[in-house]
């Protein structure tokens, strides 16, 4: 049906999250219509991003430096840490411009069905960070899916002996993801956070 190179391109594009066969085909055909210089720039940007972006050694957010811009920023509050599942959540919360503290990215949520337990997440570095920095508050901002709730409860219980632990209030449906919420909903959720019982 497709020439082999086009079929390979479509196959590779389908590996991206949220990209099905039709979208992959549409993207592939669009790429082929673009000037070669644009396609080369796209390919180079992909390779450079993969090579140059790593994880912050403090919070595990994506960064091109050993310590990310947020952790290096002296204007950010050191006494509040917001714990999220992944970097997309940091980006979503940053868009609200409401949170002035620092973050900790777990790298996912506890999901036994997917073979992800606490040891696959950055929970141990979080506990070490909280015991050393002694923040006044840790905010748990994890999406309210079944796995997210499990992770929130697990991490919350581990942190309670060290500091005040709150979670954001949700105007999101159960099973919804933070990255898809609008800025107003996220801002209200941050303002309405409450302490874990």
Swiss-Prot record:
GO terms for molecular function: DNA binding; zinc ion binding. InterPro entries: DNA_Rcmb_RecR (IPR000093), Hlx-hairpin-Hlx_DNA-bd_motif (IPR003583), Rcmb_RecR (IPR023627), Rcmb_RecR_Znf (IPR015967), TOPRIM_dom (IPR006171), TOPRIM_RecR (IPR034137). Residues 79-173 form the Toprim domain. A zinc finger (C4-type) spans 56-71. Gene3D superfamilies: 3.30.60.80, 3.40.1360.10, 6.10.250.240, RecR Domain 1. It comes from the Bacteria. The keyword Nucleotidyltransferase does not apply. Keywords: DNA damage, DNA recombination, DNA repair, Metal-binding, Zinc, Zinc-finger. The keyword DNA repair applies. GO terms for biological process: DNA recombination; DNA repair. May play a role in DNA repair. It seems to be involved in an RecBC-independent recombinational process of DNA repair. It may act with RecF and RecO. Belongs to the RecR family. This is Recombination protein RecR. It comes from Nostoc sp. (strain PCC 7120 / SAG 25.82 / UTEX 2576).
